[in-house]
C-alpha cells in the first residue's frame, strides 16, 4: 500500500505552476479518500502523436504527471492514436489535415521511447485510445453523440469564431471533444491534466463521466509553453520547438537563444527551482549566467551531467571565443534543392552558389523560406563565421561548412 503525504502537502505540491483546478474542493476530497483507503488516484494526460518526438512543451504536462507520481499516485500517459486521426481543432482557424494510421503509429513509437525520460515506469500506464474506439459500432457513436448538443460545441471559442466567420467546421471535428472526454470514462480518471487551451475538452470529460454514472474527474490546467519565438505555443509545425531527443549542443544552443523574459517562464515550467529562488535570481543574477544555468539544467535532465558540461564548453568556445564547436550537429542537404546558377559566385574551385533562405529551411533552422529571409535581414545568419546579408552565398561544394542562426549552429554538407 502506498504511503501518502498529508493532503495539504499533496495539494501544495500539485498546485505549483498550475493555472486552474476545477474544482479544488473535489480534489481535496479525492485526496482524502485516497489517503484513507490507501488507493492511488488515477491521473490522466493525453498526447496526440501528430509529429514525431516529444518536445519541451509536452513536458510541462509530463512534469505535472510526475508530481502526482512522486506523491504515490498512478499516472496514465494516453497516446491518442485514434483522436490523432480526427485532429484536435483547438485553436485552429481551419480543419487540420488528416494523418494516416501508419504515420500516427510511427510517431507514437517515438513517444513510447521517450516517456520514461521523465516518468517512472513502475507507476505509469501507457495506453492507446484506439484500444476502445476500434471496438465501437455506429450505434455506440450515436449514443455518445447524444450526450451533447451542437449549441454546446459552438460555445468553444475556436468553433464559435469559425462559425461567425462562415468558415467550415467539419462534423468529425465536433466529435473530438467527445472522444477526448470518453477517454476519461474508459480510463476511470480521477484527475485530467491539460493546457489552458484544452479546458473545454477537459470539461466535456467531467460531463461524460457523470452521464455514465462515474464520479467526475478534477480538471487541472497548466500554462502553454511558448516556443523559441516567444509568441506562439511550442510546436514542431511552427518551427519553434526544442525536442527532448535533440543533441546536447543543439538543445543548449536553442535554450541560449530565448529572450531573457522568456527564460524565467522556462525556469518556472521546466525546472524544479522554487519560485522564491527564481525571484531572487531575477534580482541578483546576471541574465546570461542565469540562462546558462537553465540550459545546463535542462540538458542534464534529458541527457547527462557530462553531456551538459560538454555542451556548455562547446557553446562557450563557439560564441565567446569564436571557435567552432567540436560536436556541431551535422545535417545533409540535397544540393539540387538549394543551388542556383550564378556566374559571379559559382566557380571551379570547389564552391557553389546557394540560396541561403532555402538552405536555412532544408537544414531545419526555420520552418519556411519567409522566416529564413527574415533571419537574413535581421543579420542573424553567419556562414563559416562570416555574417551574411545577401540572399545568395558561395559555400564549399564538397565538404561541410558551419552555419549559425542566432545561437544555433549546424555543420551542413551538400549531397
Regions found by a protein language model. Give the residues of each.
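Conserved nucleotide- and phosphate/pyrophosphate-binding catalytic cores
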Residues: 208-415
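Divalent-metal (Mg2+/Mn2+/Ca2+)-assisted nucleotide/phosphate chemistry catalytic cores
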Residues: 18, 98-221
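Active-site rim/loop-helix segments in enzyme catalytic domains that contact anionic ligands
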Residues: 66, 77-115
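Short, hydrophobic/aliphatic alpha-helical segments
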Residues: 38-47, 75, 176-186, 227, ...
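N-terminal catalytic cores of NTP/NDP-binding nucleotidyl/phosphoryl-transfer enzymes
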Residues: 27-89, 193-199, 205
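Buried hydrophobic packing segments
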Residues: 61-65, 178, 201-209, 298, ...
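Short acidic, glycine/serine/threonine-rich loops at helix termini
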Residues: 87-91, 136-142, 230-234
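Positively charged, low-complexity intrinsically disordered leader regions
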Residues: 1-44
Amino acid at each position: 500500500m502506498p504511503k501518502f503525504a498529508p493532503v495539504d502537502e499533496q495539494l501544495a505540491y500539485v498546485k505549483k505552476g498550475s493555472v486552474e483546478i476545477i474544482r479544488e474542493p473535489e480534489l481535496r476530497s479525492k485526496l482524502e479518500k485516497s489517503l484513507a483507503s490507501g488507493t492511488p488516484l488515477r491521473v490522466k494526460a493525453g498526447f496526440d502523436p501528430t509529429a514525431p518526438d516529444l518536445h519541451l512543451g509536452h513536458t510541462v504536462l509530463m512534469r505535472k504527471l510526475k508530481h502526482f507520481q512522486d506523491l504515490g499516485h498512478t499516472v496514465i500517459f494516453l497516446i491518442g492514436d485514434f483522436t490523432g486521426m480526427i485532429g484536435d481543432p483547438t485553436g485552429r482557424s481551419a480543419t487540420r489535415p488528416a494523418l494516416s494510421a501508419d504515420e500516427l503509429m510511427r510517431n507514437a513509437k517515438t513517444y513510447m521511447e521517450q516517456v520514461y525520460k521523465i516518468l517512472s515506469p513502475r507507476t505509469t500506464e501507457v495506453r492507446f485510445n484506439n484500444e476502445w474506439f476500434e471496438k465501437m459500432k455506429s450505434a455506440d457513436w450515436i449514443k455518445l453523440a447524444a450526450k451533447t448538443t451542437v449549441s454546446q460545441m459552438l460555445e468553444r471559442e475556436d468553433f464559435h469564431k469559425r462559425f461567425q466567420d462562415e468558415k467550415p467546421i467539419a462534423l468529425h471535428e465536433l466529435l473530438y471533444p467527445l472522444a477526448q472526454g470518453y477517454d476519461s470514462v474508459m480510463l476511470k480518471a480521477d484527475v485530467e491534466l491539460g493546457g489552458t487551451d484544452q479546458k473545454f475538452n477537459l470539461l466535456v470529460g467531467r460531463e461524460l463521466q457523470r452521464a455514465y454514472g462515474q464520479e467526475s474527474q478534477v480538471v487541472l490546467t497548466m500554462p502553454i509553453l511558448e516556443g523559441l519565438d516567444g509568441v506562439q505555443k511550442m510546436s514542431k509545425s511552427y518551427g519553434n520547438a526544442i525536442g527532448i531527443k535533440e543533441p546536447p549542443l543543439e538543445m543548449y544552443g536553442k535554450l541560449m537563444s530565448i529572450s531573457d523574459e522568456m527564460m524565467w517562464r522556462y525556469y518556472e515550467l521546466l525546472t524544479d527551482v522554487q519560485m522564491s529562488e527564481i525571484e531572487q535570481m531575477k534580482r541578483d543574477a546576471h541574465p546570461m549566467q542565469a540562462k546558462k544555468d537553465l540550459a545546463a539544467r535542462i540538458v542534464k535532465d534529458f541527457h547527462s551531467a557530462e553531456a551538459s558540461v560538454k555542451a556548455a564548453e562547446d557553446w562557450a568556445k563557439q560564441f565567446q571565443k569564436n571557435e567552432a564547436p567540436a560536436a556541431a550537429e551535422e545535417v545533409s542537404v540535397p544540393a539540387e534543392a538549394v543551388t542556383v546558377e550564378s556566374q559571379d559566385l559559382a566557380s571551379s574551385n570547389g564552391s557553389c552558389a546557394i540560396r541561403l533562405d532555402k538552405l536555412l529551411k532544408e537544414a531545419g533552422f526555420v520552418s519556411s523560406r519567409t522566416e529564413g529571409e527574415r533571419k537574413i535581414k535581421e543579420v542573424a545568419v553567419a556562414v563559416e563565421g562570416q555574417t551574411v546579408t545577401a540572399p545568395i552565398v558561395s559555400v564549399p561544394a564538397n565538404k561541410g561548412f558551419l552555419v549559425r542562426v542566432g545561437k544555433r549552429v549546424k555543420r551542413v554538407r551538400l549531397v
